[in-house]
Amino acid sequence: MTHTSGINVIGTESSHGINFSEKGAINWTIAKANATARTKRASFNYNNANYVLLAGIIRKVTGKSYAANVKSRIVKPLHLKHTYIYRNIPRSKTDAISYLYRHGKNYQSASYANKYVVLQLPGAGNLFSTASDYYKIQQGLHNGKILTGKQFNYLSHLKSKVNTYSGGYYLKNGGKLKLAYGNFGDTHFTNWMQLTTDNKNGIVMFLNQPYGSKNQIKSVGYSILKHIKSGTFIRR
C-alpha cells in the first residue's frame, strides 16, 4: 500500500498474450516477483505488482474473488451504475476508446486498453469506471459506506510510508489534499484527481484524448481548481 516492499516486476503493462483468469494473473505475478531482483526494501518504488498481490491477499482472507469483493463492498453499497471489473462489462456497453489530438485533428490513433494487459492486472488495472462513479468511491472511502473517516486516515498514514504516498494517494498541504495521477500502457488514457480529503471540493479528470505532457495536463486541471476554491489547491 506504500510501495516500499521492494517488489519490482517488469512489464506489467506489456501484453504477454495470455487470457488470464483472476487467480492465474495473481499466480503469474507471484512467480514473476519471486524471479525478479528486488529494489531496496523500505524505499519507494511504485509497481503494479503490489496491488495485484493485494488482490490475492483479499482472495485469501475473504475466500471470495477480488471481483466479488469489489461488487459486494463497493459497487452495491454505493449503487454504482458505471463501474465494472473488465470481464463483467455488459455486452450492451463498451469500454472507452482513447485518442490523440494530433496535427490539429481530434480522434487520431484510436486505442482500446489491451485485453491481455487488463486481465493480468487484477487490483491494479482491471476496474473500469467513470469520473462520477469514481468520485462516489472517494466519498465512500470517508463517509462509512466503504471506510470511516478514521479508517481512511489509517489507510493514508501507514507507518511504512517513506514519502507522502500511502493507500493510493499522495497527501499534500499537511494532509488537507489527496492527489493521484495515472495512465495506462500503450493507450492515451490519462486520469488526474485532486480533492480535499473531506471530498467537498476538487476535480476528477478522466481523459481519453489528452494533449501535452503530464504537467501540462495538470495545469489545465489546476486552472479549473482555482475557480472552484481559490487558494486551496496546488499546481501539481
Walk through the language-model features, giving the residues of each.
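Aromatic/pi-system hotspot detector in well-structured domains
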Residues: 51, 100-101, 195-197, 204
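A short local loop/turn or secondary-structure capping micro-motif enriched for an aromatic residue
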Residues: 188-190, 211-214
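Short, surface-exposed beta-strand/loop micro-motifs that present aromatic residues
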Residues: 181, 189-197, 202
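Short, surface-exposed loop or secondary-structure junction motifs
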Residues: 1-179, 185
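Structural recognition of the beta-strand scaffold that forms the well-ordered cores
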Residues: 45, 84, 194, 202-206
